[in-house]
Amino acid sequence: MSYTTRQIGAKNTLDYRVFIEKAGKVVSPFHDIPLYADEENQIFNMVVEIPRWTNAKLEITKEEAMNPIIQDTKKGKLRYVRNCFPHHGYIHNYGAFPQTWEDPNVAHPETKAYGDNDPLDVLEIGETIAYTGQVKQVKVLGVMALLDEGETDWKIIVIDVHDPLAPKLNDIEDVEKHLPGLLRATNEWFRIYKIPDGKPENQFAFSGEAKNRKYALDVIRECHEAWCQLVAGKAADDKKVSLANSTLQESVAYAPEVAAAVPAANPLPDAPIDKSIDKWFFISGSA
């Protein structure tokens, strides 16, 4: 199952859009791409939003039809993650699981916090730097529960099935064995990455502990079930999420004509990034 990207506009601009295509036709990375690449063997599809070591805060947009990847904004300005020493940009390939939804109408019984109204976040820890819009096949290793401004924001830890280390990584304890320090650094990064923007340190549920593969699979199942309710029009409140899709004929927003109306590719050279984004921030007590 091969996916390609359709870029419109220049990276680092408000007009930048990356749509996902299958066989030349636009599909929604939120709704159309299957969660499972191989359900029997528990192999999942991950949509990459942000390549490792980059700063632009790219995300699958919930509001626009066919859910292209765009750069997030705040007060009309493009958002970038700051460099928190010793890290540069995002610490991992960062993306989302399609066909999942962290329901903002439901509080998780253990975190006591409501979902963040997004697809599940995914951290791919393999050796290769991914690209925006790439659809990777991954195996699940564990999960961290970030409490982001009072909302449950799960971070599923995965590795590309084609990574050389993939055969050795089967659960969360294998990560510490083969990639010592990675989980500690991941915890640190998520705790401090908003501090340069004047926000407080993020908190974790479970005292920052990474839960195992089984726990992560349960979270994925719950969020997939929530998504099923969403696209069926049965969610308590859909929060104005665009449900338009081109493959789910039984859903409330099956709309292949919307996909067909997406403009042709028009990639432009990257716009320059303000030099201030290169700055390193040194945060007391982060090491």
Swiss-Prot record:
It is an enzyme of class 3 (hydrolase). GO terms for biological process: phosphate-containing compound metabolic process. Mg(2+) 1 binds at D116, D121, D153. GO terms for molecular function: inorganic diphosphate phosphatase activity; magnesium ion binding. Its cofactor is Mg(2+). GO terms for cellular component: cytoplasm. Its main location: cytoplasm. It catalyses: diphosphate + H2O = 2 phosphate + H(+). The keyword ATP-binding does not apply. PROSITE patterns: PPASE. It is found in: Cytoplasm. Diphosphate binds at R79. Keywords: Cytoplasm, Hydrolase, Magnesium, Metal-binding. It comes from the Eukaryota. Its EC number is 3.6.1.1. Signal peptide: none annotated. Mg(2+) 2 binds at D121. InterPro entries: Pyrophosphatase, Pyrophosphatase_sf. Belongs to the PPase family. This is Inorganic pyrophosphatase. The lineage of its organism: Eukaryota, Fungi, Dikarya, Ascomycota, Saccharomycotina. The gene is IPP1.
